[in-house]
């Protein structure tokens, strides 16, 4: 089963613009096959925004920071970054618009929040 899963991943990786993938087959909660680096941390960008937002809100609830904690030099707060109104672009650090004036879909804003959460809690990924 593991060889078949590895072959399947290799086949799909050749057509995708990504260098790595990992997979697993589970049956009744038991892992029966794995392929790829199971310990690698993958940037899943948009897929993780919901889970990330939940994590940030738990941190707010537990007093790690509040929604109005300033995160960037330009004054973007947790609230701004969660709502894509922090002024930062999709992948850029440089501001694209003044904070709070426009919503710009931003993975980078979530990276900033994640970095701050890790530094405040001393918890890794």
Give a label for each model feature:
Residues 43-47, 51, 59-94, 119-125:
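Active-site helix/loop module of the DD-peptidase/beta-lactamase fold
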Residues 4-44, 83:
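A short, well-structured edge-of-sheet supersecondary motif
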Residues 10, 114-117:
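Amphipathic alpha-helical segments within well-ordered protein domains
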Residues 51-54, 108-114:
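Well-ordered alpha-helical segments within folded domains of soluble proteins
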Residues 37-39, 66, 98:
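Residue-level signal for pocket-adjacent positions within structured domains
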Residues 23-31, 76-112, 123-125:
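Short, charged, amphipathic alpha-helices and their helix-cap/turn boundaries
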């Amino acid at each position: 089963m593991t060889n078949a899963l590895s072959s399947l991943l290799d086949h799909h990786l050749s057509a995708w613009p990504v260098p790595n993938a990992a997979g697993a087959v589970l049956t009744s909660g038991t892992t029966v096959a794995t392929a790829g680096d199971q310990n690698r941390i993958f940037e899943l960008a948009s897929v993780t925004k919901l889970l990330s937002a939940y994590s940030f809100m738990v941190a707010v609830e537990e007093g790690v920071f509040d929604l109005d904690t300033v995160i960037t030099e330009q004054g973007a707060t947790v609230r701004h970054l969660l709502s894509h109104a922090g002024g930062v672009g999709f992948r850029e650090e440089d501001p694209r618009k003044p904070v709070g004036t426009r919503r710009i879909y931003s993975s980078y804003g979530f990276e900033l929040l994640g970095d701050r959460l890790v530094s405040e809690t001393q918890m890794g990924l």
